[in-house]
Curated annotation (Swiss-Prot):
Source organism: Synechococcus sp. (strain JA-3-3Ab)
Annotated NCBIfam families: rplT_bact
Biological processes per GO annotation: ribosomal large subunit assembly; translation
Leader sequence residues: none
Gene: rplT
Gene3D superfamilies (alphabetical): 6.10.160.10, Ribosomal protein L20
Name this protein carries in UniProt: Large ribosomal subunit protein bL20
Amino acid sequence: MRVKRGNVARKRRKKILKLAKGFRGAGSKLFRTANQQVMKALRSAYRDRRRKKRDFRRLWIARINAATRAQGLRYSEFIDGLKKGNIQLNRKMLARLAFLDPEAFTQVVEAARQARAS
């Protein structure tokens, strides 16, 4: 029996061109170019969704480190003090606290310092 493809190919190409909307030049007009651009864009999006998590964690650590060094404590010592003092604040919240409410952050640093001392 003969298999008729109907409009399968057209639908597939239209789907790719729709994804390529907004790309520059031939990247949004010609199927082969658009297909390559879309595949690369999807690969980058997949990779960068994972990278974003790493990048934000690095940013939070850098901010916390800067804030703790201003108080005379290294980042590693600060985290050690938090663990020993059973203070369960994640790095995102610590970075926000250091940026938005320095007084409260100072209290957390002091609590970590005392937990390390005891």
